[in-house]
Amino acid sequence: VIETLQKQEKVQLIITTHSPNLASKIKLGNLIICSGNNAFPMGKDYTKLKEDSYVFLEKFLDVTKSNLFFAKGVILVEGWAEEILIPSLAKAIGIDLTAKGVSVVNIGNVGFDHYSKIFLRKNVPFMDIPVAVVTDCDVREYELDGNEYERKDNIDSERKSKINEIESKSFENVKYFVAPHWTLEYCLNLSDTLKQEFQKIVKSIHTRGGWNSDFEKELARKLIIGKLEKTEIAYKLANYLDSLENIPLEESDTICYLKKAIEYAAGN
């Protein structure tokens, strides 16, 4: 009905809803998000979205992703592993994302700009909904040298430069949280808190390979050739986290970036 009415001329239709299903059927430019004491129109004159983003979002904003319009906080991720793991990690550090009204939205590999700029305004007032963007730094720490995968030398400056480049995209209420090493999985393997359980799970899923001789190198090889079962690993690690309470995550832990993203989106 909504889609039909939107095609008619000289008809003004006003709908108030908390339904992501209905919101996903309305043209993005016609939406108005009410937050606090302000109303934020989503039209082209108000947001920092480009024309192609409107076209893209009207095609790909499904019911699940439309949850972000009703959230008190948003965490944007680019893969199933993060989407599965973050709610369980949040619970393990004492934050209930559901109770806080935080939505974790998996945008896949389409780029964050399409989604994050929904929340960026051309003029004041700016939106007060915290948006945490969680992403990998994607600087490989191993490379193929002949027939062997070897650790790259002197990548600290390259990694730091890439992280700074990504974090510089933070603006207004949108903040980027970047994996300090390569990918989520690589950071899990370096984590003081979860390394042991992560390695146990990986070995239970990938029963073949040189895990016992050099786990890090085998992990790097799997990441490079795209053969790591990231989703299954995340499910099992999430189940493990669900059994924990108040786990310590120090600032130096390589997955602390996830904790910071959770805290930011939850308003902690």
What are these regions (language model features)?
Residues 3, 8, 23-268:
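Acidic, divalent-metal-binding catalytic cores of TOPRIM
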Residues 16-18:
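H-loop/switch region of ABC-family ATPase nucleotide-binding domains
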